[in-house]
């Protein structure tokens, strides 16, 4: 199908992400305004910005999502749970949680399961497990996905964007593994309309990107050509 197909509402796929350590309150306000204007599902921000983002989006349809254990996933389970619960107390509705990659590679499947399951159960919110697929073999991707789905996540997410980004092949692989049990979030390095459409066609149900406005504008321009 052509990338300009009218059946695709690109904005409804985008988690509008502001995940740079130098982000200011002014930038956060601008991102929240953009998310409301373009009707993005969420604004994704660091935990320290959750409360302000919730205030800025009070009464709006756009939700606030945040990242947990970001970007390395190597904090303790207790710290991750606290970070997640505090974020929910501050109004976050979706949590993008980086899994412990060292545990995965060490074969500590039960510890990994318990960590993710506890966050899912204790917060009661939408949890997206960040697998960091660029750092994993196909066997490790499959194992991580199965553990996280069994633990109760709502999405499998490809990447933090710090160690490589989303690829069409990884999205297809996760879609095949998930068999429709969970959504697939592609994240990292999504800068062009062609990339976004390819990832969606491959099976992505969310896109994590800081370029959401640019992507929607690119699509609009393509329609008008």
UniProtKB/Swiss-Prot annotation:
The keyword DNA damage does not apply. Pathway: Carbohydrate degradation; 2-deoxy-D-ribose 1-phosphate degradation; D-glyceraldehyde 3-phosphate and acetaldehyde from 2-deoxy-alpha-D-ribose 1-phosphate: step 2/2. One of its GO terms (molecular function) is deoxyribose-phosphate aldolase activity. The keyword Ubl conjugation does not apply. GO terms for biological process: 2-deoxyribose 1-phosphate catabolic process; carbohydrate catabolic process; deoxyribonucleotide catabolic process. The active site is at residues 96, 157, 185. Keywords: Cytoplasm, Lyase, Schiff base. It catalyses: 2-deoxy-D-ribose 5-phosphate = D-glyceraldehyde 3-phosphate + acetaldehyde. Its EC number is 4.1.2.4. One of its GO terms (cellular component) is cytoplasm. It is found in: Cytoplasm. NCBIfam families: deoC. Catalyzes a reversible aldol reaction between acetaldehyde and D-glyceraldehyde 3-phosphate to generate 2-deoxy-D-ribose 5-phosphate. Belongs to the DeoC/FbaB aldolase family. DeoC type 1 subfamily. This is Deoxyribose-phosphate aldolase. It comes from Microcystis aeruginosa (strain NIES-843 / IAM M-2473). The lineage of its organism: Bacteria, Bacillati, Cyanobacteriota, Cyanophyceae, Oscillatoriophycideae.
């Amino acid at each position: 199908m052509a990338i300009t197909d009218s059946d695709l509402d690109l904005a409804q796929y985008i988690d509008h992400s502001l995940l740079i350590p130098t982000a200011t309150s002014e930038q956060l306000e601008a991102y929240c305004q953009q998310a409301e204007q373009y009707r993005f599902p969420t604004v994704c921000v660091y935990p320290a910005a959750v409360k302000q983002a919730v205030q800025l989006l009070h009464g709006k349809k756009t939700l606030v999502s945040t990242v947990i254990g970001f970007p390395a996933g190597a904090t303790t389970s207790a710290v991750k749970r606290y970070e997640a619960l505090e974020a929910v107390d501050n109004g976050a509705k979706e949590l993008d949680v980086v899994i412990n990659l060292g545990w995965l590679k060490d074969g500590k499947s039960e510890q990994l399961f318990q960590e993710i399951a506890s966050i899912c159960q204790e917060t009661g919110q939408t949890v997206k497990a960040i697998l960091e697929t660029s750092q994993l073999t196909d066997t490790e991707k499959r194992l991580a996905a199965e553990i996280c789905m069994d633990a109760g996540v709502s999405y499998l997410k490809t990447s933090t964007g710090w160690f490589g980004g989303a690829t069409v092949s990884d999205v297809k692989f996760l879609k095949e593994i998930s068999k429709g049990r969970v959504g697939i979030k592609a994240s990292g390095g999504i800068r062009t309309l062609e990339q976004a459409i390819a990832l969606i066609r491959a099976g992505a149900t969310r896109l994590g990107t800081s370029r959401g406005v640019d992507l929607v504008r690119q699509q609009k321009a393509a329609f008008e050509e």
